[in-house]
Every structure is written in structure tokens, then in C-alpha cells.
């Protein structure tokens, strides 16, 4: 069995090497065609990642700008969040068919705080996430939004809409950040944790 251990480096993904790069004009692409590879190399900032990934919607854009402005430099809510997800990954082990980007994105949401984790810990199994085992009675609006977003990512449903994300009364700021971060994980996998506060374009 061949195991691919190749990992992109900043040198591999230099914009000057891209076919969309013109010497006197710079990048001529409307959207970066190699964003996933650049994220893996750790040269993409949070602003670029979010704006390239989340669909543009005027009211939501205003909220996204605040997320970008106040990005703490990590996708994790805190150290406890990181430890909970790492623990759950260790408990579940590795299963190639199960461990998709969407699976990890949902796990990220369901381990984001202690209450939602206790309510959904029994949902994790060898085949994926069985959302029907969650204990949602008397859960907070914040955690309910995270739960529905996690289910959307895994089951490709749309319980949480773009209109919901644009409404602070429906999706609070902390929930919005977590859902946006989970969307990045669903698109780019665990490499999304390499996203920085500022991209390499600020360091030239």
C-alpha cells in the first residue's frame, strides 16, 4: 500500500509560478485556483480563505468582515475545544471511508463547548455521526444552531441557510464564527487549521 506523505511548502505554491500570474499585472484570476494547496502550505490568511469560500451575500458580508477583523489567529475556540476534538479523534480511530472533510467539520462543531459535546458524544460511531442520538432537550439556541449546521455539513441538508447566517438574532457571533470555520474545514480538510491571521501577501 502506498501512503502519500507529500505536503506543499510555501515555495511550491509561490504565486509567481502560477499560470494565472502575469509579471506586470500580478494575479489575473478572479478566484485562486490553488487555494487548497496554498492553505496546506500555510500561506493563506483568514480573510482570503473566508472570502474565497463563503458565498457573497450583502448582509452576511458585513458580518464576515467583523469575523475577519477580529480573527484570533486560530480556528479553535480555546484549548479545551482542541483537546475535546483530539480526544474524540483518538477514541474513534481512523476509518478512511468515514473520515471525510465533512465528518471532521461536524466534529469540530460538536466539540466546540462542553455542553454540546456531552449532548452529542454518543452520536459518534464507526460509521460516522448518528445525529438521532443527540440529547437536545433544553439546549441553548447557540448549541442548537451548531448542531443543525453540523448535520447540514454531513447530510448535505440546508437547515441553516445563508439568510440565517446573516441574522444576528438567529445565529449569534460566536456561532457564526464556528460555522464559518467548519465550512473551511469541510472544504479544505484538516489543512484549514493552517490558516493564519495574515497571508503571505502581507509579508513580501
Predicted region positions:
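GHKL/Bergerat-fold ATPase module
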Residues: 154-158
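Extended, charge-biased low-complexity segments
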Residues: 1-138, 159-204
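Long, hydrophobic alpha/beta structural blocks
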Residues: 143-146
